[in-house]
A protein has these predicted regions:
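Flexible "arm" and connector segments at domain edges
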Residues: 1-79, 85-151
């Protein structure tokens, strides 16, 4: 770890304590992950890869599904947090490899939601008969076809 990065990690660590009275934020979670993946962090977290984290993502997604099916809203909140952690973890690994940043993932999904909801976000589409799911699928197929042509 470079000197400046090590100093940043040390300075960040002081903000994270079990007794912290303030609520944590998404940026806090991202910083916690940076610390966990740093040289001063957790050996298990440091050695994880995209591939080794797949079972964790699947497990957490399954636990979200189970909480929904059981109408267990208290557990749902916790399980959604666990699933969010997986997303942030993947983005942190991607950023470390110079692939993309968390902000890129947020930008990508935001743009996709706007594109796939043209009736809501000012697209030039006629009113539909309530089959917005069909519209979503048509737009999705068109996007995939366009992406396959450009790759």
């Amino acid at each position: 770890m470079k000197g400046k990065e090590a100093d940043t990690i040390k300075s960040l660590k002081q903000f994270f304590t079990a007794e912290r009275p303030d609520a944590y934020t998404l940026e806090d979670l991202r910083n916690i992950l940076r610390i966990l993946r740093s040289d001063e962090g957790c050996p298990w977290d440091r050695k994880q890869t995209f591939e080794t984290m797949v079972p964790c993502v699947l497990e957490e997604a399954g636990e979200v599904t189970e909480a929904v099916r059981n109408q267990d809203t208290e557990n749902l909140c916790e399980e959604l947090g666990d699933l969010l952690f997986q997303v942030v973890f993947y983005c942190q690994m991607a950023e470390e490899q110079g692939l993309f940043a968390f902000e890129d993932a947020v930008d990508g999904i935001s743009r996709k939601m706007v594109r796939r909801h043209p009736k809501i976000f000012g697209g030039d589409l006629p009113e539909t008969d309530g089959n917005e799911g069909d519209l979503w699928e048509r737009i999705k197929r068109a996007e995939k076809a366009k992406n396959h042509k450009t790759t």
